[in-house]
């Protein structure tokens, strides 16, 4: 059982109130956060029925949002309502960008959703562009190509306060710390 800390690290993050109209987007980036406890032993949860989607990040030029769905710490969107909205996005004919598309699209299919439009997988594209890179993580690619990285200091601070592993047990945190 996870003990809720008396004092939580501050966070300025707020969930988006709505998803903007994206029908004119030429490309949409999508990233799933998952709880996948058996991935190392029995394979991805989307194939084995073990685990679930914890949250979905969506980004287009000029807007980005993270939609928490199953964080044990609360602050979640209604899954059924969000799924209907996500289906509309996935039905758009524009390019969809994923990092490790096989994994994320597998989870979306397990949810009964289909991705329409071209799928671009940065995890596959990166070694084709530069086979001699040391790392192909999304953070490493963002740093090298966009001069941007994500700060995980808030995640690690919150995980320490909650007494959990920041990566393996991220789903136990309230959404604002992810």
Show where each model-derived region lies.
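N-terminal accessory regions of nucleic-acid-interacting proteins
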Residues: 1-40
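Short, flexible, glycine/charge-rich loop motifs used to bind or transfer phosphoryl groups or to couple energy/partner
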Residues: 17-19, 46, 84-88
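Active-site-proximal helix-loop-helix substrate-binding element of RNase H-like nuclease domains
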Residues: 2-9, 51-178
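Short consensus segments that form the blades of beta-propeller domains
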Residues: 44-50
């Amino acid at each position: 059982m996870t003990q809720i800390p008396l004092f939580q690290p501050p966070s300025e993050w707020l969930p988006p109130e709505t998803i903007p109209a994206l029908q004119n987007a030429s490309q949409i980036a999508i990233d799933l956060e998952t709880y996948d406890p058996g991935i190392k032993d029995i394979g991805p949860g989307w194939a084995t029925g073990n685990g679930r989607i914890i949250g979905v990040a969506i980004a287009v030029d000029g807007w980005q949002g993270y939609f928490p769905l199953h964080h044990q710490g609360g602050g979640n969107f209604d899954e059924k309502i969000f799924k209907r909205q996500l289906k509309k996005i996935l039905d758009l004919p524009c390019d969809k960008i994923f990092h490790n598309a096989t994994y994320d699209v597998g989870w979306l299919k397990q949810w009964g959703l289909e991705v329409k439009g071209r799928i671009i997988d940065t995890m596959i594209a990166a070694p084709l562009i530069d086979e001699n890179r040391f790392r192909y993580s999304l953070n490493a690619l963002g740093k090298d190509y966009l001069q941007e990285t994500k700060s995980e200091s808030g995640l690690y601070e919150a995980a320490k306060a909650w007494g959990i592993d920041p990566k393996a047990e991220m789903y136990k945190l309230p959404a604002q710390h992810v």
